[in-house]
Amino acid sequence: MNVSKYVAIFFFVFIQLISVGKVFANADEWMTTFRENIAQTWQQPEHYDLYIPAITWHARFAYDKEKTDRYNERPWGGGFGQSRWDEKGNWHGLYAMAFKDSWNKWEPIAGYGWESTWRPLADENFHLGLGFTAGVTARDNWNYIPLPVLLPLASVGYGPATFQMTYIPGTYNNGNVYFAWMRFQF
C-alpha cells in the first residue's frame, strides 16, 4: 500500500471521529432541552387536562380475524395531566392515564408528550399537532412490569378540546394498534 492510501485512510477515520463527537454533543444538547421542558411543564403548567380514552383499533392486516373478534376496542378509563404551550406554539404535557386494554385488563400509562403545533386556518382555535410521547406503561400479560414507551403522537383540536392519537407498532398478531383519546384543557 502506498503512502497516499495510508493518508486517505487516516483522514477518513479522523473525520469519522470528529463526526461522532458532534453527534454526542448534539445528543447532550437534546437531552438537556428534553429535561428542561419536562421540568418547566411540571413547575409552570398553564392548563390542567382531562383525558378520556376513545378507541383502540387493531390493524386488520396484521391480525387473524379470530383474534380481533375477541379484542376490546372500546377502552374506558381516564386520566389527568398538566400542560403548557411554549413560545413557538408547541404543546408540552405530563399525564397519567389508565384504560382497559385489548384483553379488557387495566393498563396504566404515565409520561411526557410533545407536539409541534400548526394553526393552518384563520381561526386560531383550530390546531393540528405532530410529535411524540415518552413514558412508562404496565400490562397484565407482562405481570405489570414497568415498560418504557416511545411513541408517535398526532392530534386535531379546536380550542380546549383535542382528539389525540398514537400508533403502537408491532409484528403479526402483536402490536399494530391505533389508540386515541380526547384531551380537554382547563
UniProtKB/Swiss-Prot annotation:
Superkingdom of source: Bacteria
Residues the record marks as site: Role in the phospholipid gating: Y172
Ribonucleoprotein in keyword set: no
Pfam families in the cross-refs: PagP (PF07017)
Positions marked as site (Role in lipopolysaccharide recognition): K67
Active-site residues, Swiss-Prot/TrEMBL: H58, D101, S102
Subcellular location: Cell outer membrane
Broad class of where this protein is predominantly found: membrane
Catalysed reactions listed for this entry: lipid A (E. coli) + a 1-hexadecanoyl-2-acyl-sn-glycero-3-phosphocholine = hepta-acyl lipid A (E. coli) + a 2-acyl-sn-glycero-3-phosphocholine; lipid IIA + a 1-hexadecanoyl-2-acyl-sn-glycero-3-phosphocholine = lipid IIB + a 2-acyl-sn-glycero-3-phosphocholine; lipid IVA (E. coli) + a 1-hexadecanoyl-2-acyl-sn-glycero-3-phosphocholine = lipid IVB (E. coli) + a 2-acyl-sn-glycero-3-phosphocholine
Gene Ontology process terms (BP): lipid A biosynthetic process
GO molecular function, one term: O-palmitoyltransferase activity
Signal sequence extent: 1-25
Entry similarity comment: Belongs to the lipid A palmitoyltransferase family.
Protein name per Swiss-Prot or TrEMBL: Lipid A palmitoyltransferase PagP
Source species: Escherichia coli O6:H1 (strain CFT073 / ATCC 700928 / UPEC)
Origin organism lineage: Bacteria, Pseudomonadati, Pseudomonadota, Gammaproteobacteria, Enterobacterales
Gene transcribed to yield this protein: pagP
